[in-house]
Amino acid sequence: MEYINSKVSGANAVVSKGDAGDSSIIISPQHLKEVCRQLKDGEHEFQVLQVIMGTDFLAENLIEVSYILASFTKNSELILKLRLPRGDENNLPKVDSVVEIWKAADFQERECYDMIGVEFLGHPDLQRILCPYDWQGFPLRKDYVTPEKYLDMVINPISKMNIEDREFGAKHAHIKGASTSVDNYKVDPPATVSETETV
């Protein structure tokens, strides 16, 4: 934290200790690129961007973007976070892209845009990556409402499986633990040690 604040004026880095898991460092969004450059090129050598993810804090009207960085030379890991106003479909939260710092950010920023609606300024090709290009809304936002249909295809969020998945499950019901009923199809239980020893 002190390192970031000493290298980037206005970064306002503070340590955040969660209820569980690792602590993180929260910074001012407008200084993201400067901070990331220092973390990658400076003495801590965070050469690897492992994950970019977004979290919707609906009650607080915030979107939190997290960057998990790793330094293999220093054997260390860092969780960097920033918080953005939640906005809406016509006024998405915005933050600079870090693709020019870590190429691995390319698809991860696209996924974060697609799923939670964060606009990464300066991204070379910011478009949906999991949903169809004309999909409406952002599926991981807590107030997202799944449409009943897409291009005349029925979407069934209750079962989480389409009919082809159910039929496949019924056809392969001879597998230990699977149900023979299409309506009650369930995932196979994990194998025990004794079952895998003879394979």
Protein language model regions, located:
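Terminal low-complexity/charged segments
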Residues: 1-199
